[in-house]
Amino acid sequence: MGQTEVLIIGCGIAGATAALRLARNPERRITIITRAPDPHESNTNYAQGGIIGRGPDDSAELLLADILAAGAGVSSPQASRILAEEGPPLLHEILEEQAGVGFDRNESGDMRWGHEAAHSRRRILHVGDSTGRAITAGLTAALERFPNIKIETNATAVDLITFPHHSRNPLDNYQPIACHGSYLFDREGKAVHRYLADITVLATGGLGRIYRNTTNPPGARGDGLAMAHRAGARIINAEYVQFHPTALAAPGAEGLLISEAVRGEGASC
């Protein structure tokens, strides 16, 4: 059995950035778990295209308008505003300053802003055509500099430890739900262990692999959504899955993605 203050399930950009923010308190013990043998292995690592920043002719209001328009009336206005206002500054603070990600620049040393579908401004930052790999490498290196962050590999989260979900007393079903960590499957030892935590963060990525055709890697199978549902979380809009529209359809090239940047710069079928 393991124990920590904060347990983060998933080591992609969401889990890694959460850990870096929380680790500012040196007394806080944080454990990140990943089912992969290598902490670099995540959906983030496979992203070829870029990430949204804030260009010189851009604003939070313009980005918010683009997000809501692309969402066709379904996106949460509150969540969209948080993303539009807080996302680009955090990109600079965490990815550039803390993780040292070297986004592409032009001959003058200024950021090279790219354009992608549904964006009214050039606001996409790239690292060549391997942006995700560069972000993953930078974040992993940053995590390793914190002595209060531990990364556990080859550990698959099976279920959340919740009260009263796992209680033997039937009357506990009337009590409020609380999460106390996760059951983890040790892929090397072939055994399930309890990992207790005061706070549990689900950062498990997507679910593309539940579909026959996808550009997602094998790990994107919806584990986090399933665990959250079993624990009593409300799952909404799960039917809205965005499929990457450009991929290489060739024998032996299953799920080989063609970057959205190709279309953003004017390519067409």
Q: What does each of the following model-derived ranges do?
A:
Residues 2-8, 27, 87, 104, ...:
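N-terminal/domain-start segments enriched in small and hydrophobic, helix-friendly residues
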Residues 70-119:
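Rossmann-like flavin
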Residues 73-77, 110-137, 208-212:
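Helix-loop-beta segment of a Rossmann-like dinucleotide-binding subdomain
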Residues 1-65, 128-269:
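Residues forming the flavin
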